[in-house]
UniProtKB/Swiss-Prot annotation:
This protein is one of the early assembly proteins of the 50S ribosomal subunit, although it is not seen to bind rRNA by itself. It is important during the early stages of 50S assembly. One of its GO terms (biological process) is translation. It comes from the Bacteria. This is Large ribosomal subunit protein uL13.
Length: 145
């Protein structure tokens, strides 16, 4: 009887990938990056093991949103003090905190729990086209569609 090969921590080979967010839609980019972080693009994907690659996203400030989401979508956070609910529109987030906007979208698409937190640590988001990970020799990854 044959068994399905399962990946473990010692057999995983991770690559560093660079994704350019310029002109890409937030949700479409986020789903593909979440899939890369989970390792679902690899034939060795195993649900209970972090088989994903490291992903570097550049040009985060040039991300696009469709429809009226720039003005209508609201991001909420709480200061943990009474009456401390704060809100920002997507336009304010893209202008002031584009990295956070992408991170929140991608984090919501990863598993909730210790494995999802470990996957999220492999994500690096930067404004502009420069990043400090040249030593890892990242490959440019072209998104589908």
């Amino acid at each position: 009887m044959r068994t399905t090969p399962m990946a473990n921590a010692s057999t995983i080979e991770r690559k560093w990938l660079v994704v350019d967010a310029a002109g890409k839609t937030l949700g479409r980019l986020s789903t593909e990056v979440a899939s890369l972080l989970r390792g679902k693009h690899k034939p060795t994907y195993t649900p209970h093991v972090d088989t994903g690659d490291h992903v570097i996203i550049i040009n985060a400030e040039k991300i696009e949103l469709t429809g009226k989401k720039l003005t209508d979508k609201i991001y909420y956070r709480h200061t943990m003090h009474p009456g401390g609910l704060k809100q920002r529109t997507a336009l304010e987030m893209r202008t002031n905190y584009p990295e956070k906007m992408l991170e929140l979208a991608i984090k919501g698409m990863l598993p909730k729990g210790p494995l999802g937190r470990q996957m999220f640590k492999k994500l690096n988001v930067y404004r502009g086209s420069e990043h400090p990970h040249q030593a890892q020799q990242p490959e440019v990854y072209e998104l589908r569609g």
